[in-house]
């Protein structure tokens, strides 16, 4: 047989679809397996090889699970709201709906050409009204429970996309969407109180099977710290500045304070500040900087002392200067910090620049050269002097703070509440109404979905308002509470909204009355295995875990955690070893590979190219190597025989079953495929194999290269579809060689080798060794003093 991929691949894709072999059943008696991949954003560029790698791991696992007798849910959908589509719509004048539908159709066809075993009956699209009705419903439940609030604050704003970005979407001072520079802008922002779930998100990590680096990234992102809130009086006025510190034991070393340029105390007491012009000029400069620019550790320290306001150190009563500096943000902590320059390098650099006192309170370093950040004995600290353990000194200081009413133990999180609105058209409308009498009111549930109006102008306003603000028929409404004339919220949700619960909808995608039926949720949830990219383990995974915990508290879902297990794929790099990008001209189109070499070749190569979790460069020669391997697989039909294979080959066959089965579960796809390549060499060397042995081989290969394996299965008369046949089982006894080759030593020197039965008794081993002509020649004419046998390893004769 020949590997005629252009003929057989569409043939088997049609047969799978006709037989509905990949459709999950909601009422099966089989054990369930829910495998999930991160659903794609359907861009105009279509699918790239990164998608193939991302989906291939659970494609292989899901195909194996079906053959193991599981009822498998392996769904796909499209995360289709978002700015790239809207920006393209603005550029071309084409409605985002049309663009999205075309892109989804193209993407679906591409995925089908590769032969992925997705359940196409459960496809979801986050832009579908029947889907985003439930996204809006979840949002309203959060609003109802007080998890939604609005605040006017400085936000990260992308002038190019004309949209507010969360901290997560503007890392490095760049827009995550268009990569242009982000600026700070004062705006009204809707937030979700994700910080209320910080502890649950941390605790939940104990109950899931995530790689350690994924857990650590989430722990770091949430950034829980234990410390103290401490009040500093401001001299001469009835005002306190609250700070948060993880090192309250260093309070005696506080020699100045720094507050954010936006801190309200500045405007409140402007008449007492004698250098207000200087302060105002500095604040104006800060307003031009992004948060990233302001908080960089490696930069020149800038700041201005507030003349006319001084703080008072609460533990020693000393007056200390107050500065404003750009590195302190109102959105972090309390907007004010205490500075201990002897033991914090940034404070040290600031103090050196502005000539501020530096007081050592922890022995161990040379503060004339740099800050000492290690542990040591407390000094210059009154009642803490002599304490050597940080834990003890912190506890003692907390006692003092609480006794005097000037501070208390507290917890802070690096993670901030989630900025949840965008000033663009192509997103879920936020279902809230602004009433002059009732304030902010929820759209009644029976009126959901609140549909996006059909518009021709998608351009956001220069004033930072959403395109929806220009549509009077959408904006103007009546208050559902009092009937007064009111206005709808015109911002839309971020793209992260739809992806925060999509895995639930797959369990019941056509339900008009609930986001999913509870019985179906109880059957399918949690997701057994979720694979995706490292770039999504913080934002998307934390957001979706937050939503899921909330729905669990609400009684809508049956498990606190959505994903039982998580795995990560590495990048596919260009042939030059660089990250693939159009600008570098090193992008590989997967459909070009399908056209030239076949889908099975593409599937096999993507998993053979290297460690699944590592970044690996593309190699056209290795693609050709995988094609040759599949050509050889097809050729196995030409050496079918009634004759049994040798014991040696039977052993290698059972070892391969064991290895491939294990390697798949451990994501060692490259070594699984390599073992099949080795086995085909052994089979070819033997010159023949039986139908039963060929069946085992193609079953092991089928999750990787299902089309050619189905074709061979049909050729040899297999019943039904190979995709749902039984996964091979190995016989442990047959994985053990019947004979072993061992070395024979005479007086400590290896003189030859012998073949003995596996597990051979020592007397038999000695007998075989002595019967060997070469060994016998070294023993001839000598007296045996000692005979030594290490089972299955070596025979040693000591002779004189």
Where is each model-derived feature located?
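Helix-rich, typically C-terminal accessory recognition domains appended to large enzymatic cores
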Residues: 79, 144-160, 250, 409-438, ...
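Conserved oxyanion/phosphate-binding beta-strand-loop segments in alpha/beta enzyme cores
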Residues: 1-36, 66-75, 99-106, 282-323, ...
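Alpha-helical recognition segments enriched in aromatics with Gly/Pro capping
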Residues: 309-332, 361, 475-614
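NTP-handling and nucleic-acid-processing catalytic cores
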Residues: 3, 8-13, 49, 134-358, ...
């Amino acid at each position: 047989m020949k590997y005629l991929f252009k003929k057989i691949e569409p043939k088997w894709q049609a047969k799978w679809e006709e037989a509905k072999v990949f459709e999950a059943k909601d009422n099966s008696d089989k054990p369930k397996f829910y495998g999930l991949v991160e659903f794609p954003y359907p861009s105009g560029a279509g699918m790239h090889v990164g998608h193939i790698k991302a989906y291939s791991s659970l494609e292989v696992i899901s195909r194996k699970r079906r053959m193991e007798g599981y009822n498998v849910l392996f769904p796909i959908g499209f995360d289709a709201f978002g700015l790239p589509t809207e920006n393209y719509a603005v550029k071309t004048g084409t409605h985002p709906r049309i663009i999205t539908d075309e892109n989804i159709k193209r993407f679906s066809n591409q995925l089908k050409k590769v032969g992925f075993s997705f359940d196409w009956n459960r496809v979801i699209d986050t832009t579908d009204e029947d889907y985003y009705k439930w996204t809006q419903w979840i949002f309203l439940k959060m609003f109802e429970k007080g998890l939604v609030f609005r605040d006017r604050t400085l936000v990260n704003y992308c002038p190019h996309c004309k949209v507010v970005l969360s901290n997560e979407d503007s890392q490095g001072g760049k827009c995550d969407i268009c990569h242009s520079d982000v600026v700070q802008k004062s705006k009204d922002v809707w937030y979700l109180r994700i910080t209320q779930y910080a502890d649950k998100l941390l605790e939940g990590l104990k109950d899931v099977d995530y790689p350690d680096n994924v857990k650590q990234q989430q722990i770091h992102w949430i950034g829980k710290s234990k410390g103290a809130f401490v009040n500093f009086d401001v001299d001469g006025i009835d005002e306190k500045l609250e700070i948060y510190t993880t090192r309250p034991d260093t309070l005696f070393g506080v020699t100045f304070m720094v507050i954010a340029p936006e801190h309200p105390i500045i405007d409140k007491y402007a008449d007492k500040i004698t250098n207000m012009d200087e302060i105002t000029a500095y604040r104006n400069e800060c307003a031009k900087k992004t948060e990233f620019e302001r908080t960089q550790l490696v930069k020149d320290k800038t700041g201005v002392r507030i003349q006319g306001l001084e703080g008072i150190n609460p533990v020693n009563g000393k007056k200390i200067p107050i500065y404003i500096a750009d590195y302190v943000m109102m959105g972090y902590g309390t907007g004010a910090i205490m500075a201990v320059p002897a033991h914090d390098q940034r404070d040290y650099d600031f103090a050196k620049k502005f000539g501020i006192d530096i007081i050592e309170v922890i022995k161990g370093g040379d503060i004339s050269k740099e800050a000492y950040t290690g542990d040591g004995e407390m000094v210059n600290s009154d009642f803490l002097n002599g304490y050597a353990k940080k834990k003890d000194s912190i506890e003692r200081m907390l006692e003092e703070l609480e006794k005097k009413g000037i501070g208390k133990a507290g917890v802070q999180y690096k993670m901030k509440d989630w900025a949840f609105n965008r000033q663009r058209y192509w997103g879920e409308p936020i279902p809230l109404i602004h009433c002059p009498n009732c304030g902010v009111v929820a759209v009644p549930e029976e009126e959901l979905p609140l549909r996006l109006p059909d518009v021709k102008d998608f351009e956001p306003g220069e004033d930072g308002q959403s395109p929806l603000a220009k549509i009077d028929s959408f904006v103007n409404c009546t208050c559902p509470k009092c009937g007064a004339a009111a206005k709808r919220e015109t911002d839309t949700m971020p793209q992260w909204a739809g992806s925060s619960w999509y895995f639930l909808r797959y369990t019941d995608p056509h339900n008009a009355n609930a986001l999913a039926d509870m019985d179906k949720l109880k059957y399918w949830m949690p997701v057994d295995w979720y694979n995706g990219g490292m770039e999504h383990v913080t934002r998307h995974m934390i957001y979706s875990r937050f939503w899921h915990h909330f729905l669990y508290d609400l009684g809508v879902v049956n498990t606190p955690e959505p994903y039982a297990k998580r795995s990560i794929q590495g990048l596919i790099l260009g042939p030059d070893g660089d990250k693939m990008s159009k600008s570098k001209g090193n992008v590989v189109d997967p459909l070009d590979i399908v056209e030239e070499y076949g889908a099975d070749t593409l599937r096999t190569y993507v998993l053979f190219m290297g460690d699944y979790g590592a970044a690996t460069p593309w190699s056209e020669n290795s693609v050709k190597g995988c094609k040759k391997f599949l050509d050889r697989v097809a050729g196995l039909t030409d050496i079918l025989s009634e004759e049994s294979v040798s014991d040696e080959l039977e052993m290698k066959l059972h070892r391969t079953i064991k290895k491939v089965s294990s390697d798949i579960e451990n994501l060692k796809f490259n070594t699984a495929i390599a073992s099949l390549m080795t086995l085909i060499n052994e089979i070819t060397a033997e010159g023949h194999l039986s139908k039963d042995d060929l069946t085992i081989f193609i079953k092991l290969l089928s999750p990787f290269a299902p089309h050619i394996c189905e074709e061979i299965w049909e050729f040899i008369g297999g019943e039904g579809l190979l995709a749902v046949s039984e996964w091979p089982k190995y016989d442990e006894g047959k994985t053990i060689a019947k004979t072993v080759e061992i070395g024979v030593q005479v007086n400590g020197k290896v003189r030859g080798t012998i073949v003995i039965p596996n597990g051979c008794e020592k007397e038999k081993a000695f007998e075989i060794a002595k019967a060997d002509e070469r060994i016998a020649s070294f023993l001839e004419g000598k007296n045996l003093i000692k005979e030594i046998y290490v089972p299955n390893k070596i025979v040693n004769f000591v002779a004189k």
